[in-house]
Curated annotation (Swiss-Prot):
GO terms for biological process: prolyl-tRNA aminoacylation. Keywords: Aminoacyl-tRNA synthetase, ATP-binding, Cytoplasm, Ligase, Nucleotide-binding, Protein biosynthesis. This is Proline--tRNA ligase. It catalyses: tRNA(Pro) + L-proline + ATP = L-prolyl-tRNA(Pro) + AMP + diphosphate. The keyword DNA-binding does not apply. It comes from Paraburkholderia phytofirmans (strain DSM 17436 / LMG 22146 / PsJN) (Burkholderia phytofirmans).
Length: 578
């Protein structure tokens, strides 16, 4: 590629709305341009990196037995109504009517469409297993698109869907996809972790997320540095922090706590550790034809409620936060002084595992400016329903028993699910088993955010000059920077010779023949992040030398002219082989 025949849209300044490094650099490097909120043009530099991500994904999906197809972005509402997600998905699902007033959606995922394919095309277990995949544009109407491609509304995604005759087959398909994802993200040159996760709106049972580790990541990941354990904080099991409950040493006492509505303030006033206070979270669930049920969830004062865990408890699937009016009616006091003792109406109490093993703890007295100290289970309160309802924290014991947890931030770039028969049962996707009886097919789904990978890679690989691409997804592998290409015949001849040698070797090279000043050339290519740079100048040629610098190198080195091409070819191939 010659730069004079390519489009290079670099900018000196980032747009004012760009908040994170990847968004700023993708705009400045001429990779993307905003069309509307969360919707971008992918300019030639950006598209080259996208195509390289897609190529690696395609190779590994094919290697794992995936079969590529292409499904429509526009999907009829009938399919979503069959699965039940038409009502459940929420405002992120972009819905519209055609001229015949028929309802359609722009697909955020394709479970319904692929299940429709399977039920019409797969009739016997002998046709299984099968794994269909596509690389397709998706749309989710995010309420607040931000961070460039990291949380856009329109994005490119690889989504795959496996169909098996039984759970053993599904587990094998899942394992193959998990292994394929490890290979994909390794080849992409990313520092990543596979973590146990919640299935969210997709549904199903087993699930893992693949996260690129970055300080700007939206997700918190709990991991054990001394073992292989890793899980999204939403899914990580929180073990009780006390092995057993200590015997009471205090009498229950109503204690003045004027103006102290928060656990931290109560602990400071009473001169006790925050860990001895109890945080009361009040939820409500609807009952058809009757008053809502009020729930009190008890957490240690320094812990936070995990709403996903809470929603999985019997009776809490559709919970909401109780209103202030409901709280006052039930407890006789506004939020801030609530507790399980002396409520005006019956409530259901759930204690976190750690709270269930506490003694001599402090709860609200259900009276403004008062808390009750020295509270104990059995003596002062009936034994509670006990459940894991909190987020893990740094320093908690690892669920695998092999150390303590640490917390880092991650950017989700891939997700694999064992769906089971959630969609096949709802949509009648059955096949005949060995006995000739119809049974719903076991499904898995497996997604990779192709465009999000670019942003995630940049969040891990940048400096004050610009992007530092992993070799495998750089828009170009090598840039040739001739000094005075339009003025010096010797420089032009050597640059053209090097260019031809690199092209013949299959190297993705760009020759900057624009005639720009050295400072402009270097700034552009450092911003774009090309991994290898060769500078050709009259002075160096007279000495038989060319200047080489890797994008991660602090200093340039001199190479003999006759060795330069093979040296750079070797560096590129070695980097790609890692």
């Amino acid at each position: 590629m010659k730069a004079s025949r390519f489009f290079i849209g670099t900018l000196k300044e980032a747009p004012a709305d760009a908040e994170i490094v990847s968004h700023k650099l993708m705009v400045r490097a001429g990779m993307i341009r905003r069309v509307a909120g969360g919707i971008y043009n992918y300019l030639p530099v950006g598209l080259r990196s996208i195509r390289k991500v897609e190529a690696i994904v395609r190779e590994e999906m094919n290697r794992a037995g995936g079969i590529e197809l292409l499904m429509p972005a526009v999907q009829p509402a009938e399919l979503w109504q069959e699965s039940g997600r038409w009502e459940k998905y929420g405002p992120e699902l972009l819905r519209f009517k055609d001229r015949r007033q028929s309802d359609f959606v722009i697909g955020p995922t394709h479970e319904e469409v692929v299940t429709d394919i399977a039920r019409n095309q797969i009739k016997s277990y002998r046709q299984l297993p099968v794994n269909f995949y596509q690389i397709q544009t998706k749309f989710r109407d995010e309420i607040r698109p931000r961070f460039g491609v990291m949380r856009g509304r329109e994005f490119i995604m690889k989504d795959a869907y496996s169909f098996d005759k039984d759970m053993d087959g599904l587990r094998e398909s899942y394992r193959k996809m998990y292994d394929a994802y490890v290979r994909i993200f390794t080849r992409l040159g990313l520092d990543f972790r596979a973590v146990a996760a919640d299935n969210g709106s997709i549904g199903g049972s087993g699930s893992h997320e693949f996260h690129v580790i970055a300080e700007t990541g939206e997700d918190a990941i709990a991991y054990c540095p001394t073992s292989d354990f890793a899980a999204n904080v939403e899914a990580a099991e929180a073990l009780p922090l006390y092995a057993e409950r200590a015997a009471p040493t205090e009498e229950m006492k109503k204690t003045p706590t004027p103006g102290k509505a928060k656990c931290e303030a109560v602990a400071e006033l009473l001169n006790i550790p925050l860990e001895r206070t109890i945080k009361s979270i009040i939820l409500a669930t609807e009952n058809e034809g009757a008053e809502p049920t009020i729930w009190l969830l008890m957490l240690r004062g320094d812990h936070d409620l995990n709403e996903i865990k809470a929603s999985k408890l019997p009776g809490l699937a559709e919970f909401r936060m109780a209103t202030e009016a409901e709280i006052i009616e039930t407890f006789g006091t506004p939020p801030g002084y609530l507790g399980p003792i002396g409520t005006k109406k019956p409530i259901k109490v759930v204690a976190d595992r750690t709270v269930a093993n506490m003694s001599d703890f402090v709860v609200g007295s259900n009276e403004v400016d008062y808390h009750t100290t020295g509270v104990n289970w059995g003596r002062d309160l009936p034994e509670p329903v006990v459940a894991d309802i909190r987020n893990v924290k740094k320093g908690d014991p690892s669920p695998d028993g092999k150390g303590v947890l640490d917390i880092c931030r991650g950017i989700e770039v891939g997700h694999v699910f064992q769906l089971g028969t959630k969609y096949s049962e709802a949509m009648g996707a059955t096949c005949l088993d060995e006995t000739g009886k119809p049974r719903p097919m076991e499904m898995g789904c497996y997604g990779i955010g192709v465009t999000r990978i670019l942003g995630a890679a940049i969040e891990q690989n940048f400096d004050d000059k610009g992007i530092i691409w992993p070799e495998s997804i750089a828009p170009f592998e090598v840039v040739l920077c001739p000094m005075g290409y339009d003025r010096s015949e010797a420089v032009r001849a050597e640059a053209d010779k090097l260019y031809a040698a690199l092209v013949e070797a299959g190297i993705d090279v760009i020759l900057d023949d624009r005639g720009e000043r050295p400072g402009v050339m270097f700034a552009d290519w450092e911003l774009i992040g090309v991994p290898h740079r060769l500078v050709i100048g009259d002075r160096g040629l007279k000495e038989g030398k060319l200047e080489y610098q890797g994008r991660r190198d602090a200093e340039a080195t001199l190479l003999p002219v006759e060795d330069a091409a093979q040296t750079v070819i070797g560096k590129v191939r070695a980097a790609l082989a890692r």
